[in-house]
UniProtKB/Swiss-Prot annotation:
Binding site for Mg(2+) 1: A258, E278, E321
Recorded coiled-coil stretches: none
Enzyme Commission numbers on file: 3.6.1.-, 3.6.1.22
Functional description taken from the UniProt entry: mRNA decapping enzyme that specifically removes the nicotinamide adenine dinucleotide (NAD) cap from a subset of mRNAs by hydrolyzing the diphosphate linkage to produce nicotinamide mononucleotide (NMN) and 5' monophosphate mRNA. The NAD-cap is present at the 5'-end of some RNAs; in contrast to the canonical N7 methylguanosine (m7G) cap, the NAD cap promotes mRNA decay. Mediates the hydrolysis of some nucleoside diphosphate derivatives.
Recorded GO CC terms: cytosol; nucleus; peroxisome
Domain Nudix hydrolase intervals: 223-351
GO biological processes: NAD catabolic process; NADH metabolic process; NADP catabolic process
Gene3D superfamilies the record matches: 3.90.79.20, Nucleoside Triphosphate Pyrophosphohydrolase
Keyword Hydrolase: yes
Species this chain originates from: Schizosaccharomyces pombe (strain 972 / ATCC 24843) (Fission yeast)
Placement of sequence motif Microbody targeting signal: 374-376
Protein name, entry field: NAD-capped RNA hydrolase
Length: 376
């Protein structure tokens, strides 16, 4: 990236708040190992439990609100409190055939503002997959289990706080379901720390266990987040935008280029590499814009703007993941963004309004991604 000088300091505006990133809960991560606190929260009459079935949250469709349950509504499914026992005691009971619904401590609502008293108004997620009776009760009371992708596409009007809570809960529940058994030795894992850590039952039950997880911190013992870059690449004169069309996209839909970061790679390097591999376009400047949690299953979208080198040309002879890649003018993008649906399909279709991809495209179209200009 040599030969590039910034004439003036970039003043990136505050990016709009992203869907899935608006939870108002105080996660209280420092209390996740406090069994006494979690046990009191579990039984407290003000605690809310958010039910999930097959990773889908329960929604009161008429109100666009999440279904919440109280302890009396779930108590019959808990033969014992998961927080009144040590991890070893729970492993012993599970080894004898007992089981419990998976719980994830999500945080405190802090309804009256920041506080040091978190004894009330706590929130858990509860996985009720397989508990048909409770699922039916929720449906009988106006609830329905909704695929989170449907919520994302604006079919429902979920609040920012609820969307953030759903993203957190779904990601953790998905992680727990994928790692029911220890990758190190194959024995059953036991959720602990409010559902945010997994401990191998063999380690808990056998002092002479040879499980690799006993020998240090492993990436399967804690939830992971996979970083992805998603970028709007601008032409050198910053008047055109590079978008691609994936084979799986509906006809006419163009979106930002994107891809996972690889080990030993910086954010900027990933933007340059992914753009080159998918389009052949060389990028000489990368600017971070915003991020969006993406709970499918546990990704974090890192949105960036990139500036293409002068006279950069599209060459699609490397990664053929995309069906088409092209530069669009600001006028073309604006025309499609402001298209009246009554006139039929827009010339260019874009990702849903709640996506960070759409926010990036709009930031370019309305020229509000920077308050100054760059000279090459």
């Amino acid at each position: 990236m040599q030969g590039f000088k910034i004439a003036r300091h970039f003043e990136l505006p505050t990016a709009p708040s992203q869907f899935f990133a608006g939870s108002s809960l105080n996660r209280l991560s420092f209390l996740r190992s406090n069994r006494e606190f979690l046990n009191k929260a579990f039984y407290d009459h003000t605690t809310r439990f958010l039910p999930f079935c097959d990773l889908n949250p329960a929604l009161l469709v008429k109100d666009d609100k999440l279904v919440t349950l109280s302890y009396p509504q779930i108590s019959k499914y808990f033969t014992f409190s998961p927080f009144e026992h040590t991890d070893k005691q729970i492993a012993e009971r599970f080894s004898k055939g007992e089981s419990l619904p998976v719980l994830v401590y999500m945080g405190n609502e802090e309804r009256n503002g920041p506080t040091d008293n978190w004894s009330q108004h706590n929130v858990f997620a509860i996985d009720i997959t397989g508990i048909d009776e409770l699922q039916q009760s929720i449906r009988d009371n106006g609830g329905t289990f909704v695929n989170l992708r449907s919520i994302f596409t604006e079919q429902y009007q979920l609040s920012a706080s609820d969307s953030g809570a759903c993203a957190f809960a779904r990601s953790i529940l998905d992680w727990i379901s994928r790692y029911r058994f220890c990758p190190g030795c194959g024995k059953r894992n036991i959720p602990t720390m409010g559902g945010t850590k997994l401990v191998c039952s063999d380690v808990l039950l056998n002092d002479d266990s040879n499980c690799p997880s006993k020998k240090g911190i492993n990436n399967y013992q804690y939830p992971r987040t996979d970083p992805c870059v998603i970028m709007v690449i601008l032409s050198h004169d910053m008047q055109h935008i590079l978008l691609g069309r994936a084979l799986r996209h509906p006809k006419g839909l163009y979106a930002c280029l994107a891809g996972f970061l690889e080990p030993g790679e910086s954010l900027e390097e990933a933007v340059v590499r992914e753009t080159y591999e998918e389009s052949g376009v060389d990028v000489e400047k990368v600017l971070y814009y915003a991020s969006q949690p993406w709970p499918f299953p546990q990704s974090l979208m890192l949105a960036c703007f990139g500036i293409a080198r002068k006279n950069a040309k599209i060459q699609r002879d490397k990664d053929l993941e995309l069906e088409d890649v092209r530069f669009f003018s600001r006028e073309e993008v604006l025309r499609s963004l402001e298209w009246d649906a009554k006139d039929g399909p827009a010339p260019i279709l874009f990702p849903p309004k709640l996506s960070i991809a759409r926010n990036l495209i709009q930031a370019f179209a309305y020229d509000d991604w920077t308050n100054s200009q760059v000279k090459m």
